[in-house]
Amino acid sequence: MEQKIAHQLNWYYYGMMVLALVAMVAMYLLVSKGTIAVIDTMSTAGKVIQYIVIFDALITIPLGLYGFKRVCDKIRSMENEELKFSLYRRYAAIRIVMVSNAMLLGIITFYWLGCYRSMLWVAAIAAISWYFTKPTARKIQIELAPKQDNEETY
């Protein structure tokens, strides 16, 4: 069952990677051809966009990672295996999308703000966090196994 769920979640995981690559290529082409005007980073609009992207990263990355851990603690104690795996799959997909959201916004605003490096760093931090959401059968077993006292989980 863990292998099947990991396979299903890999569609979300690699789908977000493809979406990030498409966003990168699309924004590069749109900005380089002048279809989308580059926003000055020191303008009011540029600063507001920067604040929104940074705030989004500061909220969604910890919420996606730690929030999922808290949900797993509740799911772990369920008796019904089918419901347990169903809820795990749903919340793991939400975690992948939440963490990837900051990466996508960082990539889009990097080009939109004229290759502003701070947005590239936001996207890089989100990409590192996104790596920790990679679903594997072993990881699913560990996260859903009953918690033992003084036991290392990873």
Predicted features along the sequence, with ranges:
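Cytosolic-side membrane-entry/anchor segment at the start of a transmembrane helix
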Residues: 1-22, 77-83, 142, 152
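Membrane-interface helix termini and inter-helical loops of multi-pass transporters
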Residues: 32-43
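Membrane-helix interface/capping segments
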Residues: 62-84
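Short membrane-interface loop/juxtamembrane segments of multi-pass integral membrane proteins
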Residues: 76-98
